[in-house]
Amino acid sequence: YKLEKSICKCETIEIGAVMLDEQLREISEFKRIIKPKYCTKIYPKYEKMTGITTAMTMEGEAFESAFHSFAQWCLDKGGEIQIIAWSGNDLSQLAREIYLKRVELSQEEKILMDGWRDFQKEFDHMLDKEYQISLDLALIYADVAFVGHRHDAVWDSRNTAELLRRTREEEDRTRIVHRAKSLFTTDPLAVSLEELFNFSCLVPQC
């Protein structure tokens, strides 16, 4: 238990997503609050950041149940489906917890995970950036205002979906590249906090 707890320094406390059709229109959403297995208290600053309190996680689902529900939600629509996320951090986090908590995956779930698409990496490549761009900064480059609560899984997904729509056409991508170049600065004081720190892994207090 001590070894597992030391490995799992952060646990997933929420799984959230929106589903898009072929025209990139939102047709469904998924949200589950997860009860951590090893950590029982969330730092107040993370409660404020995410809107998820310790009390909420204590009423949440086990990770295994929530993950299987998410996978089933994805697969129930039938046909081809691909998970698109802002950065590969979510995939790495899920993979670590699946391994640590010994979650058995079906063949369909394995295929679903293998098809994960890192949209942040694509966006960085589009702008020819060697560093990772935050979702907030990417939206600024696309001239899109963030809608909803930041660090809420569903709202982050919804804003990622909007960014995906804004980069669908070559003309739109070219416009974003030009805007990014006009806004880019080498002044380190102008870099956003999310460029300096990775908030994707929220550490509950153990």
Question: What positions do the PLM features span?
Answer:
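Active-site-proximal helix-loop-helix substrate-binding element of RNase H-like nuclease domains
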Residues: 41, 47-50, 54-57, 121-155
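Active-site catalytic microenvironments for nucleophilic, acid-base chemistry
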Residues: 97-101, 141, 166-170
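A contiguous pocket-lining binding segment that forms or flanks enzyme active sites
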Residues: 113-122
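Alpha-helical transmembrane segments that form the membrane-embedded catalytic/substrate-binding core
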Residues: 153-163
